[in-house]
A protein has these predicted regions:
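Catalytic-core helical/loop segments in enzymes performing group transfer/polymerization on anionic/lipid-linked
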Residues: 1-272
Length: 272
């Protein structure tokens, strides 16, 4: 489906269904549903064969994540507890310089602006290849081991049925994806809260690409602890980017899964 058509359909769906039925521990998790729809509707691989292959790969990936989460729970790095600012990014934004060192094009320029005036720690939400030498020190934040048996109530199932009628996306696939994303969100929420709760001086968290379960979990943990979150956009965002534009039912107090503020690339991105 074309990006513009997917965007318009997501806006229609959000306007038509009850988005308040998706709650976990007091958190409205509709942003997870939106992200699922965005991926499903814009994906070119939608046949059954691809879906089955993807499901098998996801099972192995989930098992690997659980094993790694257990391992890292016993081998946590020592984290400074007097940070005033924390930056959280992704290795995909690393670019090689002439010096052969790697520079994070999203967060490193901001870190340089703050200089020595702030106590800062930078995290990545996945491992950085050993061969890459970075300009600035960093730590890797790992999701916690958390096994949750997730069930859907009748109201949630009803909304998924409505979404299927409007979008033709498989009802079972929607439910499977939601449980998968919610588990990931929970693991990152638990991990982030454990780290952030020890940061008594922390005022702000700068993060990239907020619209995945890892960053949503981090945002929710920060929200619960009263820590401000800022999404630093990784590029210009068009008017059909459904994770930034076209939100119709944002709660009065906002979504805890979303950042408090957005740093946009220019006025057009702000307008969108």
């Amino acid at each position: 489906m074309k990006t513009s058509d997917a965007f318009k359909l997501i806006v229609q769906i959000e306007s038509s269904v009850d988005t308040d039925v998706f709650i976990w521990k007091g958190f409205n998790t509709w942003p997870l549903i939106r992200q699922i729809l965005w991926v499903e509707l814009t994906s070119t691989a939608s046949n059954d064969k691809t879906s089955k292959k993807g499901s098998t790969l996801e099972i192995f990936a989930s098992i690997k994540k659980i094993v790694l989460a257990i391992y890292y729970s016993f081998s946590e790095a020592k984290i400074s507890q007097d940070n005033t600012k924390i930056f959280i990014s992704r290795p995909v934004y690393l670019q090689e310089l002439h010096s052969k060192k790697y520079f994070d094009r999203i967060v490193d320029p901001i870190i340089e602006l703050f200089g020595l005036n702030e106590k800062i720690t930078k995290f990545y939400v996945s491992n950085v290849p050993n061969k890459k030498e970075l300009m600035y020190e960093f730590l890797v934040m790992h999701q916690s081991f958390s096994f949750n048996i997730l069930t859907l109530d009748s109201e949630q199932k009803k909304v998924f049925q409505q979404i299927t009628r409007l979008s033709s996306v498989s009802n079972l696939e929607l439910q499977r994806r939601y449980k998968q994303k919610l588990r990931s969100f929970i693991r990152w929420f638990v991990a982030a809260k454990k780290i952030l709760s020890k940061q008594k001086k922390l005022k702000e968290i700068y993060l990239t690409s907020w619209y995945f379960p890892d960053m949503m979990g981090i945002c929710a943990a920060a929200s619960e602890l009263g820590i401000k979150t800022i999404d630093v956009q990784h590029g210009k965002q068009g008017k059909y980017q459904a994770m930034y534009c076209g939100w119709k039912k944002i709660p009065e107090s906002g979504y805890a899964l979303m950042p408090d503020n957005f740093w946009c690339w220019g006025q057009p991105s702000c307008d969108h």
